[in-house]
Amino acid sequence: MMRVPTFALTPPSGDELHDILRHSRSAVASYLLEPDESHQANACLYICNNRSYCLENLSVAGRRDARRAGRSLRIEFVDWPTVMAHGFTAFSETRTRVGLPDGTVEQFQSRFHQFSLNPFHCAVGAWQDDSLVAFMTLVVVDDWVEIEGSFSADNSRTSCPNDGLAHFVLSHFLIKRRFNTVSYGLSSIQDAQQTIGLHSYKKKVGFDAKPVHRAFVLHPLLRPFANPLILRGARMVTKMLPQNRMIKKASGVLVTLLENSPTSLMS
């Protein structure tokens, strides 16, 4: 269970953590802190607070790709029935590209049905003619936004739909609506090559990569299992089942708890 908003950096109390783990079904609670001598940076928080955001502030590649999307695609807010009717291809092909096996109709319907029930959740879509070739899912509360997910079809990637969606979201919320913060989440705890590509993409479209310390607190019943032997076993299973997201996440949590390894993105 990750604290929301993700970008909150104040330390929670011990009582708060105890109550969350006791009353939820979560095996682990996670939150962010400012790095210090006791909490070294081990993750990146992707965040934009620039209320003067514009294309001219981006790199040459960032401007080029956002403009390409603007010429090729129609980008707008989309309602949930539209996502459910037209978004499966973008979702499924994205999950396959990142090596995950859950790009199924059942997972798509379950995920976005549940997500759509919260009135603070919405979506932005990119259309190419009558095809929804990409969409972003958002959490919008008070004066902040978190990008929860981003999905695009394989045959649309030359049009840079994700760049166009990011530009739309930053322009709409920071400039038009004068929000304070747009967050694009955290670097992954999973040992995956895609992490480097995502890091470069998020910086290209206008987000700062803020070094943070990501802390994990295991449920008391699981703490005896956080040991080097279990970590070694988790790494072996990850090699045998590289598409198993749960095992990859568990391995990442154990690495952070036992080795406190700074993320390679810090270098």
Predicted segments, located by residue:
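Charged/polar, solvent-exposed surface patches and flexible loops
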Residues: 19, 64-71, 85, 89-96, ...
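Residue-identity detector for threonine
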Residues: 6, 10, 82, 89, ...
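Acyl-donor binding region in acyl/amide transferases
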Residues: 1-41, 53-56, 80-83, 139-213
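Short, charge-rich amphipathic segments
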Residues: 1, 14-28, 41-52, 93-107, ...
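A conserved beta-strand-loop-helix scaffold within acyl/acetyltransferase catalytic domains
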Residues: 31-39, 48-159, 167, 171-174
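Active-site/acyl-donor-binding loops of N-acyltransferases
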Residues: 34-55, 182-267
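Short N-terminal signal/transit or membrane-insertion segments
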Residues: 1-10, 60-74, 142-146, 236-254
